[in-house]
Structures are given as C-alpha cells and as structure tokens.
C-alpha cells in the first residue's frame, strides 16, 4: 500500500519491524514448545495420550520458572500439554489464546498421570530448539522448531515426513526481512523515523495498546512479584516521589509483572520476547504522555525504540547469558531521547551510557524476577537520557564503551556472542542443580 510512497530501504526496515514485533501470549520459550506440541497434535485424529519433548539448554533455562497463562502452573510440561490439548497451531506466539478451561483441566490431568516428559536435547548445537512428539494410540506426530520461536523446520508422523525446511533453508535466510539490519546504522534508522509517512508506521501503535493494557493489569492484580503495584503503594506512603522517573519504573514493572505472572493478555513482543517488547514500549509511552505527544509522535518514537532494539539484538544470539531487557531498554532510551530532544548525538550518548551501565546483567532464565531486570533497565535508560540531555555520557575512555556508538554496540554484542557462552553454561548448570 505504501511502497510507492517510500524508498526501498524504508520498506525493508518496516518489514523487519513487522517480523520482530508481534503479539505473544505467555513467555515465548514455553510458548515455542506449546506451538510444537499443538502442531504435532494437529497431525493426529485421535485423543492425545502422551507427549515426549526435547529442548535446548537455553530454552530449558527460560522455561523452568515461568507461569503459563491460564494455568497457574510453572514450566515446560504444562506448556506442552496445553499446547497439544488446547492450542491453535496457526496462531504462532498466541498458540494458547483460545485454550478452554476444559483443555487446561485435561492438560493438568495428563501431567498428573505422568504422561508428559520434557528432556534436554543432547547433543544440541542450536540455541533455540524445541521438539514435541505427541502420541495417540498407535499413531504419533513429531514437530521440531529451530532458530526462532515459531520456525517449524520438520513435521513427521508414523506414516512418514510431512514437511522439512532443510532443502530451502539457505534461500529463506537470504530472504529474511532482518538481512537489512546488517547493512544499516542507527543514524539511518533515525533518518527513516523522521521522514517515513505516518500511515506506513501507524501499526506500531498496537504495541502501546497491548503493552499498556498489560501495565494496567499489573497494577490492578497481584501478578508475579507485583513490583509495580508495590512501588505504587510506596508512592502513597511518601517513600517514592510521584514523578516521571517513578512513573516509568512503576508502569514498566507492572507490565512485566502481569506478563511473567501468567496474565491472559498478549504482550507485543520484540525479537521474540514479551519483556523486550514491554521494555521498548512502556517507558516511551510514559514520556510521550508527559510531553503531550500526539499519535504520530508516539508512533515515530516507538518505531525508533523498537527498531533500535531489533538492530542491537540482531547482533546477539537469539538467547544468551546477556539479559536482553538491557538491549531493549537501549531502544527505549533512543525513543525517549527523540521525544525530548530529537538529536542523533543525544540518542547515541544515551545508548553509550546504557552500555557502560547495565551491560553485565545476566539472563538466569525467564521467571517473575524478570520484572526486576525490566524495571532496572527502564530506570537506567531514563537516567542515560537525562545525562545525554546535558551532553554527558560514558565515554570511549571507559570500559567497553568506544568513541562511537556503533563500535560500543559491537563490543557489547561480541561479549555475548563469545565470552559469555561459558557464563551461560554455568548459569544452566546452577539452575539444573536446583531442580534436582
């Protein structure tokens, strides 16, 4: 619709955002297994009787401690069971959105009977891997997802192979909407945000709608660690100031509380993560309200935030030892700085200060405590913006921060890609030892 009005680079950037910014119900690692189970069950005619599943260490890490929406239960087994018994394989990251109360009860009964097993895939060279084998009588179906939360690469049944992606994997990689990110820069992203027609990016306002609703739910209910609602009470007690900084902290935390606590509301995700989507959205929304931004300014700020977060995360493994709420918050820093100042120099300084501040935060699995890291990252982003507005930032003389923001980002991502791989293994070992 808009192709004739905008240049090809802008169109590719829009496609990259549409690829990476999608609604997701529930933490995306257990949801990936739920999708595999749902797709396997869809190949069978009879009643689901048993499920065997295998996942990569990173997916196990992010699935052990998080609540599956609508179940009140934690972990990968309930995700697999509910996916098979009540999931919609065509709904992607919203696979569980229409799961009925009966499906939840049946899934819990399947678990109680000991008919669901989730195991580590060994050996496993894929960071993101989930496989579900679903049995019905003498029939079975097996679905494998690799590389991305919804990327089904193989469907097989007792009658033979139904689908395999292996034959056209290289062509699909070349055609990926994310390829453009390897050939652009933050400065080009800012130029795009400033000039692209509003109607071409209006869709990003859905992120504000979905993640704003999660934030409101987090403040209403007692979800997860209820950080947002707890801090709101401390405001009423006079222990926290009722100001813009606190509002960013409370409203962003509340959305993650609801998300990780199992609220049956979708998040608008970023780079396959609901918490990253929340972190890239809610702080920008709060600042936009504060400055009286209209829908167009909000859309441009959100587009800058989400696209910057995608741009940085594209240089990382899909899952790693680095908490990606930090990189999503770098996007939020860009969006907030743009709303107040608009200069590239301010945005670059804010991101550099973020890299000098929170870059060492580890990911120790998806859980209610993710809301702590989301709130920390959002607060750090606002602090970095305030510093940048006064032309102050962590400089290239300090730590891993370089003299230009692109090199700083590269330094951060190289740590996650190389040095932090051993850290990730040790985190998984510690978590596995706790589970036994």
Swiss-Prot record:
Entry superkingdom: Bacteria
Record-level GO BP terms: L-cysteine catabolic process to pyruvate
Annotated GO MF terms: L-cysteine desulfhydrase activity
PANTHER family: UPF0597 PROTEIN YHAM
Family: Belongs to the UPF0597 family.
Protein name in the entry: UPF0597 protein YhaM
Originating gene: yhaM
């Amino acid at each position: 619709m808009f192709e004739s009005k905008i240049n090809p680079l802008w169109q590719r950037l829009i496609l990259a955002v549409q690829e990476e910014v999608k609604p997701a119900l529930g933490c995306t690692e257990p949801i990936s297994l739920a999708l595999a189970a749902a797709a396997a069950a869809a190949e069978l005619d009879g009643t689901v009787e048993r499920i065997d599943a295998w996942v990569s260490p990173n997916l196990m890490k992010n699935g052990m401690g998080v609540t599956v929406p609508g179940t009140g239960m934690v972990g990968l087994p309930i995700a697999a069971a509910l996916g098979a018994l009540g999931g919609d394989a065509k709904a992607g990251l919203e696979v569980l959105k229409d799961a009925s109360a009966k499906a939840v009860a049946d899934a819990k009964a399947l678990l109680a009977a000991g008919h669901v097993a989730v195991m580590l895939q060994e050996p496993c060279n894929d960071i993101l891997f989930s496989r579900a084998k679903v049995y019905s009588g003498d029939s079975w179906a097996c679905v494998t997802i690799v590389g991305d939360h919804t990327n089904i690469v193989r469907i097989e049944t007792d009658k033979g192979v139904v689908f395999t992606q292996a034959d056209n994997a290289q062509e699909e990689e070349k055609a990926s909407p994310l390829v453009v990110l390897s050939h652009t820069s933050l400065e080009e992203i800012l130029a795009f945000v400033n000039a692209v027609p509003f109607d071409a990016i209006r869709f990003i306002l859905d992120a504000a709608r979905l993640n704003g609703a999660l934030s409101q739910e987090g403040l209403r209910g007692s979800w997860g660690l209820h950080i947002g609602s707890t801090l709101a009470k401390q405001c009423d007690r006079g222990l926290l100031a009722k100001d813009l900084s606190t509002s960013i902290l409370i409203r962003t935390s509340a959305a993650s509380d609801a998300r990780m606590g199992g609220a049956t509301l979708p998040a608008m995700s970023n780079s396959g993560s609901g918490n990253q989507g929340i972190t890239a959205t809610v702080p920008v929304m709060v600042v936009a309200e504060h400055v009286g931004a209209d829908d167009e300014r909000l859309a441009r700020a959100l587009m800058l935030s989400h696209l910057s977060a995608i741009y940085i995360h594209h240089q990382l493994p899909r899952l790693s030892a680095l908490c990606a709420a930090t990189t999503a918050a770098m996007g939020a820093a860009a969006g907030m700085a743009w709303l107040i100042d608009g200069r590239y120099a301010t945005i670059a300084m804010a991101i550099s200060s973020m890299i000098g501040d929170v870059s060492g935060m580890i990911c120790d699995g998806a859980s209610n405590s993710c809301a702590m890291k989301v709130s920390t990252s959002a607060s750090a982003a606002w602090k970095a913006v305030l510093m940048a507005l006064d032309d102050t930032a962590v400089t290239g003389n300090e730590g891993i921060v370089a003299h230009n923001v692109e090199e700083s980002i590269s330094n951060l991502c190289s740590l996650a890609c190389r040095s932090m791989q051993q850290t990730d293994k040790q985190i998984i070992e510690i978590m596995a030892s706790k589970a036994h």
